[in-house]
């Protein structure tokens, strides 16, 4: 039987990422053959990964890789935020973003078939990571973004990589693009313009806003404050020419009732119309980038800021780790029991 030296164990660990005891056991089983030991560890890793396949992985990191006119944003999930800080996990996320930017796969299946720098597929790398790290590791989603030579990428990660944003802007420069990405990270727009919002979605969101007003009015009534009116509209898509014309007529009637001389109406009406539009585009402000108040200058919307610097947003991608994933909610006792059971089964 071959002697299992510390040097041999170290070599296997460096090649496989396995722990000391796992590496030593594998070498003993295959009589010191490194290649057979790697294959054995891979098989055991696949078995461990299969046991973890039904677990919920809602933590993790985003990764961004930019090269020339191509950028990739990825979300890689783990089960705990502790593992998300693991050096091996961080390296895997960064390598994933790089190979996806270079390979430009169309979907997750194609992405997992890409070859990593180690020579193994991305899927095999995730199986190995699941086995060695001890948690389910999975590629949740990715986006490949491309630009022209005249355009600029804005790449930004926030909160230790939990949020990743890439924007593409026409005009301006990289500094402006990055500022826009910082805004996107903070304000969570889902689309660029109101024209991309679904009509029923706007109606549903408007109903939610008015429900919130009703609740606020209940509190206001208790302290004898006047009730706030319901919002009639929520998006520019609902502000037809007829609606705008009627709003202007209502403002003129209001000014006449207040006794304001007609010769100064032209100075008052534009400001009141701006206020009308602001009050009746709350859904746009929540979900569309261009309608949001710019976080770097709250006197402007993002659209107005971009116009002031002769720039425009072509597209953007924003990933936030775990968004839309329903996390398991266990009490502490159940969590400890589950952890102990998992340890016994591994």
Curated annotation (Swiss-Prot):
Short name of one Pfam family: EF_TS
Matches recorded under Gene3D superfamilies: 1.10.286.20, DNA helicase RuvA subunit, C-terminal domain, Elongation factor Ts, dimerisation domain
GO molecular function terms noted in the UniProt entry: translation elongation factor activity
Entry keyword set: Cytoplasm, Elongation factor, Protein biosynthesis
Subcellular localization, as worded in the UniProt entry: Cytoplasm
Span list, region Involved in Mg(2+) ion dislocation from EF-Tu: 80-83
PROSITE patterns per record: EF_TS_1, EF_TS_2
Cross-referenced InterPro entries: EF-Ts_dimer_sf, Transl_elong_EFTs/EF1B, Transl_elong_EFTs/EF1B_dimer, Transl_elong_Ts_CS, UBA-like_sf
GO cellular component: cytoplasm
Predominant location category: cytoplasm
NCBIfam families, A to Z: tsf
Similarity comment: Belongs to the EF-Ts family.
Summary of the function given for this chain in its UniProt record: Associates with the EF-Tu.GDP complex and induces the exchange of GDP to GTP. It remains bound to the aminoacyl-tRNA.EF-Tu.GTP complex up to the GTP hydrolysis stage on the ribosome.
Name under which the protein is recorded: Elongation factor Ts
Name of encoding gene: tsf
